[in-house]
Amino acid sequence: MLTLLTNKTYEKERIVYKCGQNNLKTKPQLLTNYIPIDKNNKNAYNKRKLDSDGFHDFSIYIDYTNINLEITRYRLTKYKSLFINGFNRVISTLESLLKVKTLNYAYTISNRQIQELGIYNWDTKLFGDSAAKRGYNTDSLGLDLIIFGKFLSSSELGESTLAAAAAEYVDVDTQQPVFGIVYLNKDVDYSLINSKEYFESIILHEFTHILGFDINYFLYFNYILIQNDKFGIQRYYINSPRVVNVAKNILIAIILLVLN
């Protein structure tokens, strides 16, 4: 079970949620024709292609179209800022982190992970070409990863599950995720989540699934979140041996800066 630690400053009792990753049964599609071309630089793909020891500027974009509609549909409007601001702050954190010199394994999704990590439903054609491919793969957007938000019920995600996420489409040449979905549980009582740090730590964890980090290092929240009681407030940042070896100081500085 994936345990979520709460901020004691905001909540008197500990709330425990699961990550619904194991409930996602399907797999992503390998894109053989995906070439992210920058509007002003047609050679951008060559710069973005991952090398074993090269620099890599990673650009992330969230399509809020669907999640905005569902926030209204499921009467979650009063929590909209929690969702939107949480996603945006996590993206800024990841983009800052991923501009440092990285190792190839941080983004490479193995064949095993492709089978286990994915969520695209070939039978129901969930989202299908109309949503996941609406120009993203051929237009000159100059983006590396597009993330799509969606709400599911507890019966679909699992009881006590707060969120789940995975890559939908993966570039066949680089094994780089190019489109992913974050699922949020529409049945959760979000009034219990009073801390933005609390929610952002969840989204940060889910984004690691889309990026394809080794599942062994991101299985439990309390494995990847280190508590810092400075000034009497609990704060969290990613702590993975594979990430820390590359960007420990930058990572800590970025996360703590964002959460201040």
Q: Whereabouts are the PLM-identified features?
A:
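Extracellular zinc-dependent metalloprotease catalytic-domain scaffold
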Residues: 1-204, 210-260
